[in-house]
Swiss-Prot record:
Domain of life: Eukaryota
GO molecular function, one term: zinc ion binding
Zinc finger motifs (B box-type), residue ranges: 5-47, 48-88
Pfam family, one: CCT
Gene: COL12
Primary residence: nucleus
BP GO terms, sorted: negative regulation of gene expression; negative regulation of long-day photoperiodism, flowering; regulation of DNA-templated transcription; regulation of secondary shoot formation
Keywords attached to this entry: Metal-binding, Nucleus, Repeat, Zinc, Zinc-finger
Record-given protein name: Zinc finger protein CONSTANS-LIKE 12
Subcellular locations according to the entry: Nucleus
Amino acid sequence: MEPKCDHCATSQALIYCKSDLAKLCLNCDVHVHSANPLSHRHIRSLICEKCFSQPAAIRCLDEKVSYCQGCHWHESNCSELGHRVQSLNPFSGCPSPTDFNRMWSSILEPPVSGLLSPFVGSFPLNDLNNTMFDTAYSMVPHNISYTQNFSDNLSFFSTESKGYPDMVLKLEEGEEDLCEGLNLDDAPLNFDVGDDIIGCSSEVHIEPDHTVPNCLLIDKTNTSSFTGSNFTVDKALEASPPGQQMNINTGLQLPLSPVLFGQIHPSLNITGENNAADYQDCGMSPGFIMSEAPWETNFEVSCPQARNEAKLRYKEKKLKRSFGKQIRYASRKARADTRKRVKGRFVKAGDSYDYDPSSPTTNN
């Protein structure tokens, strides 16, 4: 049984919002999540067609069914049958029908434009496209696992995707052929040599007068030499000798090549020597590049001395403590000093005693 939209209760629910725990049709999804900036940031996805209570994460292309992660593990037999499986990326914002068609053209049938009415709420669809969708549309992919083979996620790197316009490499006219060799399908994640990124061997050299596109060059306006070396910007792309390697991996999960994106800092030391000045120029805290680690201090050496000093201070304080006697009940003490005793104990009136505080003879 097809689930109904929780908002209008008439149309088929296609979207599941985990923040609102609601099943929505496309019309109500645009209406609800365009109300305020907070709802605009809600993460949604297609609804799971098995349990109808979770966002779908995987789409079986052979069965044409969307599954959430739990249903895919326990209910579906796609893995055993060898079906083709496509991962679904969540989204946020208010995508237009054109954006929906681009994202799920192979999934939603009929097209999204046929599922959306020409009027959403009280605004025509064309007005929404010109105002809200063009200014507030944002695609936010989540939980993207980077693997060594990017063939499953070619749509994420597609030039048609408008989610990240700043990452699209713009080439000048006549320079498209030079970047055809840029293939990320078989590229490993950890690059020890900069030439491995663009598939060049160490024996290949680029002629100085050869035109290189802007996406593969360092900033042309910067002609200053690198710190601690005689290399200039014009020779930055020359291949290094086989024995010399430059490690550009700084601990990120997905290393990006500075040569590829044109972000090599002019003070980068190609010789491989790192100093505090280089990191200060690039905005990195010098605390990360100290000659000694923060835990490699002289604390172990000075520990016995500090312990002895602490013991001396404790003994001095102990000697200065005052244990003066304080009479708690002065009236009782005054009476006790005048009572008669026998073997140190008080005696009753009329009984024999061996000590009388008022008699000087008994005291002696």
